[in-house]
């Protein structure tokens, strides 16, 4: 039961007089919405206030949700409210003051337990060892868990919805084929797939373009399943899956290099070394495609506290200009840049719906905390793309042959279906000097 709730409830109501949401407490008391119908936030335990008190902002609210001490009847609506409704009254200091008042009113005397799904890495960032630990935290939840929401190809990166009403499977096939087209893959070539995941690009490239592929990942379970999928398709003679850091690859050069959804894990301190390694790994005249998430605004934080602790430890989506400058300083020539922000928002919408459709199995495989982490993350990430906080880019480059600049045409757009037959939802970006 609430011990001395009334003064606090009056203070909360006064601090938030215009509320597009309701708050319901664990004893049934409710602070109703005052500005139309909206989501209801359910405070299931005083620990919710303690989490916010100890870590005001995104991390405290995330911990409260993951632990189950805070819930919301409409998660999408709740995130939209938090994104759009940011009154000056609820700046961080006010959050702390209200949380402290709640702790006193409800007799909170101990720090709450931090959810087990949280990770806080130690040591210097972006060493080989720490990067391996970060990847294990994200991917080793289980292959079966990811299969609940990914498409049948197990492609864990942005799909491309060029036709408007295609399935997730079709959109992922379009993306994989687009990567092959941009790399200009030819039969008999040797290709490197950095961050190969469960092998979707390697399998597609080998099956449809007759190339051989070396794919690398830092996740042992991921590599095991990728090898199994390769063997099932009779491609073991053309695809090699390794557990290896990109910095340790020493058997280049390759005819083409694809890095899909990996650059956001590299970090600002390592981006130049990463770009130099790409140059070392591709033959003169060969192509490189760098596909990854980036920030849209210079000066935005690299990754939120919740994402750092629960999803992508040490994740650092950089601004496009920072990535492109590193690639060009290393010696690559940029030919084409394309933005797929709307497509990633749609991809995340599909993933979130599929996870919800398999919620009981997700809880069985990953546990309730981990499942809540992913339900929150998939929706929060989608909001980031929809509101313009983040985007995803494909940067197509080549390594010049000696001092001569490589000749590679820059198309108006290389999206599937961009021949006028269907509207395009993302636009090719002109190549700008990177400085």
Residue ranges and their predicted role:
Residues 1-166, 170-172, 178:
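Feature captures hydrophobic
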Residues 187-195:
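Conserved class I S-adenosyl-L-methionine
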Residues 198-209:
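Conserved SAM-binding loop of SAM-dependent methyltransferases across substrates and taxa
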Residues 226-227:
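Conserved SAM-binding loop
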Residues 247-257:
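A short acidic, Gly/Pro-enriched loop at the edge of an enzyme's catalytic core
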Residues 272-285:
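A short glycine-rich, Lys/Arg-flanked "PGG" loop and its adjoining helix->strand segment in the class I
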Residues 285-293:
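Conserved beta-strand signature within the Rossmann-like core of class I S-adenosyl-L-methionine
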Residues 293-405, 412, 416:
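Substrate-binding/catalytic lobe of Class I Rossmann-like enzymes that use SAM or dcSAM, i.e.
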């Amino acid at each position: 039961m609430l011990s001395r709730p009334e003064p606090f409830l009056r203070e909360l109501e006064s601090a938030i007089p215009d509320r597009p949401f309701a708050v319901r407490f664990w004893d049934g008391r409710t602070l109703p919405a005052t500005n139309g119908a909206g989501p209801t936030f359910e405070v299931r335990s005083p620990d919710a206030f303690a989490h916010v008190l100890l870590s005001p902002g995104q991390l405290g609210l995330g911990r409260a949700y993951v632990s189950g001490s805070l819930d919301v009847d409409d998660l999408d609506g709740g995130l939209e409210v938090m994104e759009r409704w940011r009154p000056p009254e609820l700046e961080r200091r006010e959050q702390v003051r209200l949380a402290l008042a709640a702790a006193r009113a409800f007799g909170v005397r101990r720090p709450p337990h931090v959810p087990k799904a949280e990770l806080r890495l130690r040591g210097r960032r972006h060493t080989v060892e720490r990067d391996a630990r970060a990847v294990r935290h994200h991917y080793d939840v289980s292959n079966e868990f990811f299969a609940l929401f990914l498409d049948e190809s197990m492609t864990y990166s942005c799909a491309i919805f060029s036709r408007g009403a295609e399935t997730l499977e079709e959109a992922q096939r379009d993306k994989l084929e687009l990567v092959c087209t941009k790399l200009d893959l030819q039969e008999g070539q040797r290709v490197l797939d950095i961050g190969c995941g469960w092998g979707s690009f390697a399998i597609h490239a080998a099956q449809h373009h007759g190339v051989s592929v070396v794919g690398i990942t830092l996740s042992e379970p991921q590599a095991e399943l990728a090898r199994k999928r390769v063997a099932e398709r009779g491609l073991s003679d053309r695809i090699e899956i390794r557990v290896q850091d990109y910095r340790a690859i020493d058997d280049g050069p390759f005819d083409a290099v694809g890095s899909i959804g990996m650059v956001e894990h590299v970090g600002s301190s390592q981006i130049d070394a990463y770009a130099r390694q790409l140059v070392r790994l591709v033959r003169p005249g060969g192509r490189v495609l760098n596909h990854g998430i980036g920030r849209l605004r210079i000066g935005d934080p690299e990754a939120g506290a919740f994402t750092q602790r629960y999803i992508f430890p040490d994740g650092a989506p950089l601004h496009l200009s920072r990535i492109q400058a590193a690639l060009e300083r290393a010696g690559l020539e940029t030919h084409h840049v394309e933005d797929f922000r709307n497509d990633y928002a749609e991809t995340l919408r599909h993933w979130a719906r599929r996870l919800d459709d398999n919620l009981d199995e997700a809880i069985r495989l990953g546990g309730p905390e981990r499942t809540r982490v992913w339900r929150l993350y998939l929706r929060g990430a989608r909001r980031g793309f929809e509101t313009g906080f983040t985007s995803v880019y494909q940067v197509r480059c080549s390594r010049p042959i000696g001092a001569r600049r490589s000749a590679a045409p820059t198309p108006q757009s290389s999206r599937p279906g961009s021949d006028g037959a269907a509207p395009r939802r993302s636009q090719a970006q002109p190549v700008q000097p990177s400085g």
